[in-house]
């Protein structure tokens, strides 16, 4: 009976009706032939064959009756009755998801998320980004506000006190002089007063005098360290307790060439044994080009007494006026003033 099915199926499918009263196919054979004919139509049309047509036909127990062309209604209508887990992939060793619209997040056992999956994902909105660290918030880049440019107008911010026990710093900013002054009574004061040395030496100007002074008070309460430019004539920034002294160039000394020394004349028992020499012109170009920090890094401390230079100081202050006249003849530059005073512990 099975061997004659291919030859008899062609006339039946093509429209040929066999003689009535003869049982040609069973219900299972007829359903399988219809399925194969439908697959053939998909192949001829060039359309992908649906997966349901590729599933094997499992006959129902009630469909055991023989199909007869004489009484087609006698046989029940055949349906594909499949268990949800029994599918094409289960037949070939793989399991097809019976609920593809459902989120696939499971605990590995029986529980499964009941929400619908996202159209572009296998998971719902809650479980789409479960693998990522959701506790970490996105970092927003904060743009720093640009620093305001210095204005030519005079702006002074001063906070000072004259209490010797608890000195407070003071900050002073001038119009053409951009200065930083931190100091108070009873504290050491560091003062740097110089124009833009980098621009000066880049233009080929020559430094006439490299000035470096160190003042040491008898009481030890106030100490000043000052660096002044050749074009600056403002000596008011020196500590009030330290009087200015004339300048003289030593004849024969072990210091660097072009070096000048200043000192506060003290009693012999209070005289410090520290000598600070300025740098040469070539060293000044490198140090002043890099800023005041480079100048301080190259200061040479020598353990030589200052007594041999005391006798060489001028007895009068006329040299100061001559120095001011020489500076007035030179080209004036905008002065940049930096004054820092650091509290020093009192030495008994």
Swiss-Prot record:
Instruction: Quote the biased-composition stretches of kind Basic residues, using this chain's numbering.
Output: 127-136
Q: Supply one GO BP term.
A: regulation of DNA-templated transcription
Return the Basic and acidic residues bias intervals: 306-320
Motif window: Bipartite nuclear localization signal: 94-112, 130-137
GO-annotated cellular components:
nucleus
Q: Primary place of residence?
A: nucleus
Q: Where in the cell is it found?
A: Nucleus
For this protein, the record's InterPro entries field holds:
Gln-Leu-Gln_QLQ, GRF, WRC_dom
Domain QLQ: from-to ranges = 24-59
Polar residues bias: start-end ranges = 148-161, 329-340
Q: What SMART domains does the annotation carry? A: QLQ (SM00951)
Q: Which UniProt keywords apply?
A: Activator, Nucleus, Transcription, Transcription regulation
Query: What are the GO MF terms of this UniProt record?
Result: ATP binding
UniProt-annotated stretches for the region Disordered = 125-165, 306-348
- One of its Pfam families is WRC
WRC domain location = 97-141
User: Is the keyword Transcription regulation assigned to this protein?
Assistant: yes
Does the keyword field hold Transcription regulation? yes
Under the heading PROSITE patterns, the entry gives: QLQ, WRC
Q: What does this protein do?
A: Transcription activator that plays a regulatory role in gibberellin-induced stem elongation.
What PANTHER family does this protein's entry cite?
Answer: GROWTH-REGULATING FACTOR 5
Q: What is known of its domains?
A: The QLQ domain and WRC domain may be involved in protein-protein interaction and DNA-binding, respectively.
Family designation? Belongs to the GRF family.
**The name this protein goes by in its record:** Growth-regulating factor 5
Instruction: Name the species this protein comes from.
Output: Oryza sativa subsp. japonica
Taxonomic placement? Eukaryota, Viridiplantae, Streptophyta, Embryophyta, Tracheophyta
């Amino acid at each position: 009976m099975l061997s004659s099915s291919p030859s008899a199926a062609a006339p039946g499918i093509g429209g040929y009706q066999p003689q009535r009263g003869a049982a040609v196919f069973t219900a299972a054979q007829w359903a399988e032939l219809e399925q194969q004919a439908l697959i053939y139509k998909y192949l001829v049309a060039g359309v992908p064959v649906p997966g349901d047509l590729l599933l094997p036909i499992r006959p129902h127990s009630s469909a055991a009756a023989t199909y007869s062309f004489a009484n087609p209604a006698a046989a029940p209508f055949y349906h594909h009755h499949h268990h949800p887990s029994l599918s094409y992939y289960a037949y070939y060793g793989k399991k097809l998801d019976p609920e593809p619209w459902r989120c696939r997040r499971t605990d590995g056992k029986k529980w499964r998320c009941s929400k619908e999956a996202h159209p572009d994902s296998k998971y719902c909105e809650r479980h789409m980004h479960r693998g990522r660290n959701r506790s970490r918030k996105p970092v927003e880049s904060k743009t720093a506000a640009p620093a305001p440019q210095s204005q030519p107008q005079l702006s002074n911010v001063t906070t000072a006190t004259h209490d010797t026990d608890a000195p407070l710093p003071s900050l002073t900013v001038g119009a053409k002089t951009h200065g930083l002054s931190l100091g108070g009574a009873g504290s050491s004061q560091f003062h740097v007063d110089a124009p833009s040395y980098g621009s000066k030496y880049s233009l080929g100007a020559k430094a006439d005098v490299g000035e470096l002074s160190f003042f040491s008070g008898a009481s030890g309460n106030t100490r000043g360290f000052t660096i002044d430019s050749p074009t600056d004539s403002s000596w008011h920034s020196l500590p009030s307790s330290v009087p200015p002294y004339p300048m003289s160039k030593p004849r024969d000394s072990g210091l660097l060439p072009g070096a000048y020394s200043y000192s506060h004349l003290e009693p012999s028992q209070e005289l410090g044994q520290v000598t600070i020499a300025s740098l040469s012109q070539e060293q000044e170009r490198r140090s002043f080009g890099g800023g005041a920090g480079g100048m301080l890094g190259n200061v040479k401390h020598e353990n030589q007494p200052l007594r041999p230079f005391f006798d060489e100081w001028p007895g009068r202050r006329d040299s100061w006026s001559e120095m001011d006249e020489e500076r007035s003849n030179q080209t004036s530059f905008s002065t940049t003033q930096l004054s820092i005073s650091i509290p020093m512990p009192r030495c008994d």
